[in-house]
Structure formats: C-alpha cells, structure tokens
Amino acid sequence: FVNDEPAGTTNTVETYVDGLTPGKRNLVRFVCGERELSVGVTTPAEPFTINVRDCGAKGDAEHDDTTNIQAAIMACPKGGRVLIPAGSYRIKSLFLKSNINIELAEGAVLLARHDRAALAYIPGTVTGNEGAGYAGTDMLPLGRWEGESFSTYCSTFTGLGVHDVCIYGRGAIDGQTDFAEDNWWNKDFKNIFRPEEGREVSRPRMIFLSECENVSLAGFTVRNSPAWNIHPILCEHVDALCLSIEGPKNSHNTDGFDPESCGFVRILGCQFSVGDDCIAVKSGKLGIDPELRPATHDVLISHCYMHDGHGAVVLGSEAAGGIKDLTVSKCLFERTDRGLRVKTRRGRGKDAVNEGITFEHIRMDEVLTPFVVNSFYFCDKDGKTDYVQSREALPVDDRTPGFGATTFCDIEATNCHAAAAYITGLPESKVTRLTFQDVHVTFADDAEPFVPAMACGVEPMVRQGIIAQNVKVLDLQNVVIEGQDGEELQLQNVDKVIRA
C-alpha cells in the first residue's frame, strides 16, 4: 500500500514500488497475513514534468521520435521529470543530461533502430590538453568494446559525464535485434565488423554510461540488445534495481549488466535471462592506459534471479585493473552453464588481481558447473596461442595476472551436470586461497557431459567432483558432494588442503 492505496503484490525481497507523491513524506506498507511493515519515504520535490508527447513524440511505432524525446530531455530543468507515457517509440540514440529523472511509464516501449546508417557513433578516446581529461590525464574516454578503447555506435541511452540521473518505470527498452541478414545477431552481418577484418565501429548497447556518477536504473525491462545490455565504465555510485534483462539463449554477446572500472555499484532484485553472462564484472584490458582501467571495487549483487546464460555472476576476463571488494549474496541461479565464474589468462597484467571476493547464501538448480575458476580463458584472437594456453610455468612478468583469496559460503547446488567445481590457476601464479564453507552439491539423474571451462584441452565431463590445479590453499569446510563418479577431489599442484 502507498499512502493507504493498494499498490500491488510481490513475492520478492527487493520490490519496485511506484505511485509515491513527489516532495512529501509517503507511507509505504507491506502486509503479509498478520504481519505488517511500514516505511516512511520522503521523496524529493519535482518542479516540472515534461511529457514527450508535448514535444511532438507520437509513440505510434512508425514515426521516428528521437529528436522529440531528446528535446524533452534537453528542456527538462534540474530535478524535473521527463515522462514517456504508454506507446511504442521508434528511436535511434538518446543522450542523457545531469539532474533529471526519466520515467518509462507502464506500456511505454522504446524501439531501437538497428540500421547502421541511421546511428551516430563516438570515438574510443579523444586526446586534449594536458590534465584536462579523466583522472588528470589528457584523455577523454568515450567508446569501449570488450575492454579496449574503440569507436562505438551510440546506445539507446548514452550518458557521458552526467550525474544525478534516474531512469525508472514499468516500461521497456527493446533493441529489436534478431538474426535477420541485416541485423546485429546475424553471424555474417556481425563478422563484417570483426576487428581482424577491419571493423571500425562496434555494436551499440542498450544503456552505455561513461564517467557518470549517481545513476539509478529501476523497474523497467531491457530486451534484445545488439550486444551487452547495460555497460557502465569509469562510473561511481550506480544502482540497478528491480530490472528485468532479457535475450534469447542463442543471442551473441548479450551480457546483462557489465560494470567496468566502476566503484560503488549495487545490483539488487534484478532478473536475467540472456545469451551470454548475466553479470560480468570487468576492468579493461592491458592495452588501455592504466589511468583508464582502474579496479572495479565495492560491488554488491543481492537478491537477483539468473535463469539461462553462460555464467550467472562472472569476474573477467577483461579485468586488467583488478576487482576488489565484491559480494554476491542471496541470489538464485537456474539453468546457467556456470554459476560463479572467474575468467582470466596470461596477458591481463600484474594488476589483474581479484581481492576481497565473497559469494554467499546462494541457491542453484540445473547449473551445469556451479564453480569455475579458469586461468586459461581462450577468447580473443590470441586466446589459443601457446603463450596463453601453455600448462608449463612461464616467467612471471608485467603480463602475468594474479588471484587473491575468494570465499564461497552457504551455497547449495542441485541437479548439476559436469563438475562440482573446476579450478585452474596458473602454475607460475597460483590461486592464493579458495575457501568453500557449507557447500552442498548434488548431480542430476540425467546429467549429460559438458565442457566446464572455455580453455584448450578441456574435454566434456559428467558428474565429476572438485577438480583443482595450481592452488596454494584449498580450504573445504563442511563441503558435501553427492552423486559424483569417481573421486570427490582431483588435485594437481595444490600446496595445502584443509578439510573440516
């Protein structure tokens, strides 16, 4: 109930509630049987609302409404609201500005155009005066593609250096991507733009943010993205709240939410069903200037539901700046290929270290391999070279990544297929410490073989226990694996095993 008026029902902990009155204290009540929780919420004042229909937008799925909606955004004063009411709005790219709210009302759908000739693009990096750029450099980071500075088609929403922005509502953003010969997921269409074939401009995202601060995304649905759905880079204080991010299982590179070199990120109460990783936390590749790939840090992922995808929550592989202080808690994974997945490889660099990583209170069902740590990830054009894939200990240099302590606590995985855990560190840079505490894994009766990690030489397997290679300390506290074929532990070059 909002101010004693019925506002709907929910079966989730993180819940999107609307209908609050701006500029006053609102009473929100949750009632479950005889139990009741009341919360007072004081909302900021909203001086003006600009309806995009008053700027000429038609919402008829035929007229191009880009300039009409952009006009409403530019006209909106500080603290105001841009209202996109119910309707289907064909658009190219919209650019955000600071200190505004954008409401995608229930029934409002932004339909992204996919014809390249209609889309603007931004360069990867622009060089300017000394000290005028990001972090005191002379560089202005704009476009990025898979961890590298790269010219990029503008996204449905593009935010460059904006702050205090909220996009919210029960509407949707639809990339309208499919496998037609002139659309982004078509293999031949996509291959024209591969880097090794001279691609100059990368695919757009649905929401792309660079150097932004205090951005909230709440309530709406994002679907059918040309590539990664939501991609913030070099941002701080970004919230993704109660979003639904969707794409077919066979769609290409459609990661759900990929924070890259960001700090203080919260992903709460979101649902994911995509063709790639649901959430992939990144921090760039080694080739980017170090100032433009700081560590991603202080990330909280909680009460999210991941169903279908390559990995539910993934670290890397483009994480040359490192990932620090990340917690994944109270989430449900279903039918993903892998559950908690860490990807790295030689060539990511000495700063590519994960530290302070905790996965806790997680339930998985029909996840093929619940835990994967892969230090031989073979994507990228050099991913299958001897340097990346050699299982021999190579000299440690500035290209060698590291792996700090990681904890997996209170996790239950049922109906698994391939292995309980597949862990491979580098022989010259072992995984420092992996702690599994209160972990229970069972296998499906009809389990089928599957390749647990994307690395050369890894064969399909079925009902295997914990496979661990090149680890300093493997700490197993109350770990139960049931239904595996063969040994529960298959260890190679593991310095110390603790069991309790």
Name the predicted role of every residue range.
Residues 1-500:
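Extracellular/periplasmic carbohydrate-active domains that bind, remodel
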